[in-house]
Amino acid sequence: MNDNIIIKGAKEHNLKNIDLTIPRNKLVVVTGLSGSGKSSLAFDTLYAEGQRRYVESLSSYARQFLGMMEKPEVESIEGLSPAISIDQKTTSKNPRSTVGTVTEIYDYLRLLYARIGVPYCPNCGKKIEKQTIDQIVDNILELEEGTRLQVLAPVVRGRKGEFTKQLEDYQKAGFIRVRIDGQMYELGEDEITLDKKKKHNVDVVVDRLIIKEGIRARLTESVETAMKYANNLVTIDVPGQEEKIYSQNYACTDCGISFEELTPRMFSFNNPFGACPECTGIGYLMRIDEDLIIPDKDKTLYDGVKAFGASTMKKGDTMAKMYFESIAKHYGVKIKDVPIKKLPKDFLNKILYGTGDEVIDFEYTSAAGTRKYSTPFEGVIPTLERRHNETKSNGMRSFYEMYMSESPCLACHGARLRKESLSVKIGELNIKELTDMSIDKIKEYINNIELTPTHAMIAEQILQELNKRLQFLIDVGLDYLTLSRPAGSLSGGEAQRIRLATQIGAGLTGVLYILDEPSIGLHQRDNDKLIATLKKLRDLGNSVIVVEHDEDTMYAADQIIDIGPGAGVHGGNVMAQGTAEEIKNTPGSITGDYLSGRKQIVVPKKRRKSNGKSIEVVGATEHNLKNITVKFPLGQFICVTGVSGSGKSTLVNEILYKTIARDLNGSNEKPGKCKQVKGLHNIDKIVNIDQSPIGRTPRSNPATYTGVFDMIRDLFAGTNEAKMRGYDKGRFSFNVPGGRCEACSGDGVLKIEMHFLSDIYVPCEVCKGKRYNKETLEVKYKGKSISDVLDMTVEEALEFFDKIPRIKSKIQTLYDVGLGYIKLGQPSTTLSGGEAQRVKLATELSKKATGKTLYILDEPTTGLHIADVHRLVDILQRLVDTGNTIIVIEHNLDLIKTCDHIIDLGPEGGDKGGQVIAVGTPEHIVKNEDSYTGKFLKKYLN
């Protein structure tokens, strides 16, 4: 096979008809400015073609499930292998997905518990032994004399099928009745037709008898018969009582509880046989949250209880007011002008959760007269939960859900599994307790359990697989994660590194792996582990192409491909190719300029002092935070640093941001646990500039998000042509009927479903993709229609609106954040996370500064080349220069070295983290020997 991947004439997106030879079975880094064409080369050309060729080789039946990829714009690619992409998109948001299920480690743990787990009685905790038939019969005979019962053989449990042959066999064997899915049928009499696509439970009725003297022999024979047909199981059905399953396998002789044979599905929370029946295996239920109902305990009952009349109570008599006053009178509690926090706890509980059986005398006066009645009070929270369950209105359901939060299931306490499954242990721990440990602790535990020689032999292969997979996760710096952590709560970098570890576990060879910035969210300390993992993937015999900006990865790569020189139309060329040393010496390579030090981000000569005010988080205990108190000085550029999993996002996003958003903006999101957040009066607003999309549909774009499109529509509506035709600004909107093309409803494209090929979008034949109707497009400003303006890049628009300061200043900020290459009308769905974040930054920059705004950014350098980081630093410094405060969660040392104040958390990740290690200027942090950040920052300050 060819030793190289040879690309000829790549023209996808902004690529300039490039020819490129990439060595196979090597670690290759593709780098370049944001928007230069790296992803167009790696993902939209190489991955798309590798995937397309593989899918094309399958049958048309298989293709309809996979979706066909479009052929990229490239003349030819030789030497291409099947491609696997490991990108930044976070793993499933499905609440049933956990780190354990995504990595498949949980499947091995289920197998381990099914094979060598020891069951204990869920009631008395006694170790469960197997039962003999005599013990089972003795247990049944303890029922009162005269008790009627049925002896059933549970022959089918939760299996799909029609079972016609089996039912015929049971009839031939002399059985008269069967119970299917809870319903009785007579064999040979009733017509039995089962849906083969549904799961069924089938029990054969072996005997019906009454407990009396001399029945033992018959009962023993019936139990033996049932066990013969039902794999050592028998069910005893006593009318009006819970059915009992007895097994010759496992049962508690004291409590009469029997266990079925341990199987892996018993430990799966995604299977009805293992899942907690109350929460169906999710681990939590949505319930009305006391903290969301009473967000401010300094208010009185009259105006502090949300969703229960707080907004109307002040205006006069309401039912809610009458309830509160009648209950207060009954218990002799004064509530007028008394803050909720000073009310007796027991009284507040009665208001929130009801008075139980205690009857209250209520008196309600309205225009219709006075009405008296006596009844127990249901309670605010039960009332709202009942209304939520009963309402048929989606609007009301959404209203009640604003006051709900996830609360652990009361049956399983968040463990997701039924009590029988949680009663099986290996050593001292059940499967839930084991998965709640961090990955490195799990590895240590399973390697130190004492096993009998038989168990050791059974478990040998399973433990081998577990050790291998756990080690891969440790190797990519994820030792701090727990296997029970929901997959949806992982950051993009964590999710990507999990998939990377899973791929190494798969052990494939001859594959082309394409990764998108795997170093995101990873502290410099763990970079070596990640690089070793990438090399391991390469050494298995794979080609590894990484889109990356991290210096360490570049130096470790066999080859670097630098795409540039600029972004958008100014990019798309190969500027340099070779090792890091060769790139350094290539003129015209911006990457080479920064690697060699010819260009660099300068350390500020002096750091800003705080304005003397601060915000302080006191006693933070959410997730792994160890009751820490942290002060954020205002008027400074602050970086929160620390290794992955040390608690940075918990402190800044979960506690600080959500508390301020609740108190300043009235947000309903529940903040993380802390005693209090002080100093909120020192700021007037908080803005979280994250990487979530600026819109969910192709209709939203940078022009609409920044607000500049409104001004452009005003401009077009003010032209003479528009005035003559009587067009207002609404005419120039593609979202409402009037000026838009109705054939495509202003989308510019039509979706065509291709069934066994992927859906394709074709330009609308009526408007030719311009979104507007002919009449609207006839209105021109400086010779351009509204559609032409949307099609301009930011850079072109800047020149076009040069003489209109209002519009120019808005577009200028987009250019300043490095987005000169994107189009004003570019659909938001095509913007990367980093681009979306910079559109938000530009929008904030264009607003009037109050000097009292707190900005929060979580890893803003994601997807940014060092030259882009340089530009970002300048913008952030501009925002702070106007008196605002910026808090950034970051690992990028080039950005960290430019900030005024660092808060370093650690020392490790997970339960070994959550402490404040160092606080102060970068110069102060590097002197702290306990700080990993300080250790790596040192060389950046010199």
What residue ranges belong to the model's regions?
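Conserved phosphate-binding elements of NTP-dependent enzyme cores
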Residues: 1-942
